[in-house]
């Protein structure tokens, strides 16, 4: 009887941990959608533009969407383009933070590119009953 009880408790714990992991993966997609809406409202981006998000870590998983590209843009010499570097999420107690570094990619020559950072967006999520809820965002610039 005790073995069955322990088995059921461990099974519930595993299911809860799996749901929590899946919930964290959805947070990246949620933060990307919120960033896209903020950029549209501020007129930094048009609806026909591509949002270039470079993943800073291989463990980050995001859905493929038409408006988002995870590759560096193709530029001519002298051109520049805004890109956003997505960092891994950080946990601070009952809060989670997702950082997007705002960068400018500059094509200086055929083989030389330069990335200049100009600030970041930070999205905050709170934990309530083992689920994450969007709290607020902050925009930092240089």
Where are the regions a protein language model picked out?
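Surface-exposed acidic loop/strand-edge motifs in secreted or periplasmic proteins
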Residues: 21-118
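N-terminal soluble segments of membrane proteins
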Residues: 19-20, 140-142
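Short beta-strand edge/turn micro-motifs at domain boundaries
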Residues: 120-141
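Bacterial Sec-dependent N-terminal signal peptides
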Residues: 1-28
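Extracellular/secretory pathway and lumenal proteins
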Residues: 16-18, 37, 124
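Compositionally biased, low-structure terminal segments
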Residues: 6, 14, 73, 122-125
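Hydrophobic side chains in beta-strands
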Residues: 10, 100, 126-127
